[in-house]
Amino acid sequence: MKKFYIAANWKMNMNRAEAKQLATEMKAGLKDGKNKYMIAPSFTLLQDVASVLKGSNILLGAQNMGLEEKGAHTGEVSVLQLLDVGVQAVILGHSERRHIYKETDDLINKKVKLALKHGLEVILCVGELLEEREAGHAEAVCERQIKKGLAEVSAKDLDKVTIAYEPVWAIGTGKNASPEDADAIHSSIRKTLAALYGEKAAKNMIIQYGGSMKPENAAGLLKKHNIDGGLIGGAGLKTETFLPIALFSE
């Protein structure tokens, strides 16, 4: 049976007590789960959540990281600091980082290479704006973001890389691509990966869907051939909405 990768991006939500409570509930709910799981809390919550998840089947993720190991980078958190609190994976290139904080493909690529250098798993987010989709450029945008985001990343590091497709127009809007539309873009992404790394490597890579996945639409999306998991935002903030997605195939 196909193993899915379901990740919860908590974004800028919760205090320490709330985060520990939710992590505890998710740990209990997923303890017998057969899929791959990750939780990405805010930086200030990482240590508390790490203490809850220790020894569990849930990876501890970060939502971003700085582009250098240390030094004069006010407000940034380095890969070494993330490792120090037990982080195992990091989300890079999220649409909010690209479009609100103006992170470029080149900057994201530097972070990807730095994370992989230190052994972190990476979820590289790609996706188009509404105007790009309406102009028929969705596939080209994703292709560019993948090629630039993975520049100088070797095939041997691909087992630590996941691609998350985020149609930007569906993030936090309640809108979502149809399963057929999402699968078509995922197929295009896999073709791009095949051109870069070969058919076998592309077939083995995980491509998550990250556009307002929720219990009501998760099964329809995850049953599609090229959709291998979900990067979950709002539905990842409550066990009653996250667990049905995380356990849908069981």
Swiss-Prot record:
Cellular localization per UniProt: Cytoplasm
Residues that coordinate or bind substrate: N9, W10, K11, G172, S212, G233, G234
A molecular function GO annotation: triose-phosphate isomerase activity
E.C. number(s) listed in UniProt: 5.3.1.1
Predominant location category: cytoplasm
GO cellular component, one term: cytosol
Catalysed reactions listed for this entry: D-glyceraldehyde 3-phosphate = dihydroxyacetone phosphate
Any one of the GO BP annotations: glycerol catabolic process
Keywords: Cytoplasm, Gluconeogenesis, Glycolysis, Isomerase
General function of this protein: Involved in the gluconeogenesis. Catalyzes stereospecifically the conversion of dihydroxyacetone phosphate (DHAP) to D-glyceraldehyde-3-phosphate (G3P).
Top EC class, one word: isomerase
HAMAP family (alphabetical): TIM_B
Protein name: Triosephosphate isomerase
Family: Belongs to the triosephosphate isomerase family.
Active-site residues (renumbered): H94 (electrophile), E166 (proton acceptor)
Species this chain originates from: Treponema denticola (strain ATCC 35405 / DSM 14222 / CIP 103919 / JCM 8153 / KCTC 15104)
Annotated metabolic or biological route of this protein: Carbohydrate biosynthesis; gluconeogenesis; Carbohydrate degradation; glycolysis; D-glyceraldehyde 3-phosphate from glycerone phosphate: step 1/1
PANTHER family on file: TRIOSEPHOSPHATE ISOMERASE
Pfam families attached to this UniProt entry: TIM
Quaternary state and interactors: Homodimer.
